[in-house]
Amino acid sequence: MRLLGIETSCDETAAAVIEHNIEGNSQILSNIVWSQTDNHAPYGGVVPEIAARAHVEILDDLILKALTDAHTKLKDIDAIAVTSGPGLIGGLLVGVMSAKALSLATGKPFIAVNHLEGHALTAVLTHNVAFPYLLLLVSGGHTQTILVHEVGNYQRLGTTIDDALGEAFDKTAKLLGLPYPGGPALEKAALLGDKNRISLPRPLKGEKRLDFSFSGLKTAVRQAATAMSPLTENDVADIAASFQAAVTDTVYDRVHLALQYFTHQYPLSHYKGRRPPALVVAGGVAANQAIRLTLQELAHQHGFEFIAPPLSLCTDNAAMIAFAGAQKFARGEKNSFDIAPRSRWPLDEKAAPLIGTGRRGTKA
């Protein structure tokens, strides 16, 4: 069967076509992503209204290109999967309404996909990773460790109680006067800096809870930058390097605990003679090489296989949405048109609220 996937949850507009067979294997036939980076660069961050308007302007063309590149006609599509949350509500509305319109016009099933589930299952698409596995999802909007038991069964072990890691990277980069997008710019600056020059906190390090926190680190960076003002290029590089070192230390500590939790539930002795369990990283921040190397080392220490999907599939894309939709469709799941997009949509909605959920409910 062939599925069309649509993704408009933030500042990438994407459409893709995949082919999914009865054995459960999938092939990406097309995967088109249009980035809005240039639209948002003058503002130093994503502007929701601009993002939504950009989705409206380009989505139809991207869907057509995805179908053309896949040598597929709309009538040959078996189902339409679309990100329905979490994300920016304006962008989600564009994608969901487009998918519903196509579904209504063609009679093809409509499938609402959780954006986080798309990230969670990407390693199954790219590496055929076996269940269960541990996922670290790090992006501009999310920082979570998730125990992926099987399709549809996700246990969130820890989440950020304030800023997501990608958000912390971008805001720190902006504070240092680095260009947007901030994550890659800060990583580049850090290569030239002294990571030991500035003492920065490692939030929650050593605590038994599995959550993350980055707002205090961001505040410490601001205080250091203010004390050193005006900043030279060397100052910026040293602050960037010190910040990145603090982040990697924090990630190491948090994921180390999550791996211990995993092996308590699924002892490594069960994997003797089999492929070891996997530590998977996904999300835009997975492009950071310092974090990747830290996770690779950590996985090796714990006897895990380290898996990082290609960067094009770590960041937001529609192939992962089509694949997640295929899993649901293969199990007979589809949605009615009365489903609405959700700005917040945790993978484990039935779980007890975590610390830091805020007045608006559990962080997605």
From Swiss-Prot:
Protein name, per record: tRNA N6-adenosine threonylcarbamoyltransferase
GO molecular function: iron ion binding; N(6)-L-threonylcarbamoyladenine synthase activity
Disulfide cysteine pairs (residue numbers): none
Described purpose of this protein according to its UniProt entry: Required for the formation of a threonylcarbamoyl group on adenosine at position 37 (t(6)A37) in tRNAs that read codons beginning with adenine. Is involved in the transfer of the threonylcarbamoyl moiety of threonylcarbamoyl-AMP (TC-AMP) to the N6 group of A37, together with TsaE and TsaB. TsaD likely plays a direct catalytic role in this reaction.
Enzyme Commission code(s) on record: 2.3.1.234
InterPro entries given in the database record: ATPase_NBD, Gcp-like_dom, KAE1/TsaD, TsaD
Organism in which the protein naturally occurs: Bartonella quintana (strain Toulouse)
A Gene Ontology biological process term: tRNA threonylcarbamoyladenosine modification
Record has Transferase as a keyword: yes
Catalytically driven reaction(s): L-threonylcarbamoyladenylate + adenosine(37) in tRNA = N(6)-L-threonylcarbamoyladenosine(37) in tRNA + AMP + H(+)
Cofactor note: Binds 1 Fe(2+) ion per subunit.
One Gene Ontology term, aspect cellular component: cytoplasm
